[in-house]
Amino acid sequence: MPAKTIEEKLKELGYELPILPSSKGIYKRCLVDGNHLYVSGHISVNTDGSSITGKLGKELNEEQGKAAARQCGLAILSSLKAELGDLGKVKRVMKLLGMVNATAEYEKHPIVINGCSELFVQLWGEDSGKGVRSAVGMGSLPGNVAVEIEAMFEIY
C-alpha cells in the first residue's frame, strides 16, 4: 500500500487549506534557491482568508493562539502548493520563526507556535516535520493578527 500524500493526510486530519489574502507589501510569498524554499511570513487566517486577530494574554487564550498558529501553518502549505504544485516535493521542514502578538506579560510563545510545529510533524513525521525554531513575542503585528510565521523548507 503506497504511503499517503500530504494532501491525503490533511484531509484525514480534517484540515482545509485557506484562501490566502492579497499581499500588502512588495515581496514574494516563496523563493526557491536550489533545494531550499524560503517562505515569507504568513499571518493567521481562517479557511475563507479572513484574519484571526487579537493579542495573546488579552483577547486570546493559549488554545486560541495554538489554533491561530496552526492556521498559519495551513496558509504556508497553501503557498507551498501554489509554488510547487505538489506538497510531496517538500523533503523536510528546516526552520520556523513564529511571532506572537502578545502582551508584555505573556510568556507562552513557544506553546502557541507548537500549533504550527505539531501540524508539520503530523504531516511529515518527527524527523522531517521538525526543524529548528524560534518563538518570540511582538508588541503588535500587521492588522492586529494573532500570529505570523515564516519558514524554510528543503525540497526535492
Which positions does each model-derived feature cover?
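Short, polar/acidic, helix-capping and beta-turn segments at strand->helix junctions
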Residues: 1-156
